[in-house]
Structure formats: C-alpha cells, structure tokens
Amino acid sequence: MEQEKIRIKLRAYDHRLLDQSVKQIIETVKRTGGVVKGPIPLPTRKRKWCVLRSPHKFDQSREHFEIREFSRILDIIRFTPQTIEALMEISLPAGVDVEVKMRG
C-alpha cells in the first residue's frame, strides 16, 4: 500500500522570490514534524518575442523580449494534521503561483 504524500509545485518569474518561498515552506513542514523531499528544480521555461521597433519601415530594426518562468517541486512524504494547518496559514509573496496535490 502506497503512503500518502503532498506534492507542491511552485512557479514564479523571479527565482529569488521562488527560492525564498520554498525555504519558508520547508521550514514550516520540518517545524511541524513533517519530512520533505526536494526542492526539485524543473527546467526553466523561456518564451521569446521579436517585435518591430518602427510601425512603418526600417524592417531590420527589431526588439527582442524574453520572459523566464522558474519552477520547483516539493514532496511532503510524512505529515501531521499540524503540518497541513500550518501550510494553509502560510503567506507567500504575490509573484509565486502554488499548486498543491494529494497523492497516494
């Protein structure tokens, strides 16, 4: 029989903000008696755009933009009811997207 675990996937455009949030979650889980596996860094998703600078002529003059999305996965292997309660009360920065799934 497989044991239940919680998988937390975090995404952000700023890697420092993301690492700070991961550290905060890990400290909370360890403080409440849980066991954490990770953080596992996922590949950075890069999106690029090429835009003409001028609205009419000068085709060779272009501007390039890039945005990077950083991701991390945390697996909480063993947890207590206090762990779940503490995770629900944690406040993370606005730029971090959190996705939580129960597995097992």
UniProtKB/Swiss-Prot annotation:
GO terms for molecular function: structural constituent of ribosome; tRNA binding. GO terms for biological process: translation. It comes from the Bacteria. InterPro entries: Ribosomal_uS10, Ribosomal_uS10_CS, Ribosomal_uS10_dom, Ribosomal_uS10_dom_sf. Pfam families: Ribosomal_S10 (PF00338). Signal peptide: none annotated. GO terms for cellular component: small ribosomal subunit. Keywords: Ribonucleoprotein, Ribosomal protein. SUPFAM superfamilies: Ribosomal protein S10. Involved in the binding of tRNA to the ribosomes. PANTHER family: 30S RIBOSOMAL PROTEIN S10 FAMILY MEMBER. NCBIfam families: PRK00596.1 (NF001861), rpsJ_bact (TIGR01049). Belongs to the universal ribosomal protein uS10 family. Part of the 30S ribosomal subunit. This is Small ribosomal subunit protein uS10. It comes from Aquifex aeolicus (strain VF5). The lineage of its organism: Bacteria, Pseudomonadati, Aquificota, Aquificia, Aquificales. The gene is rpsJ.
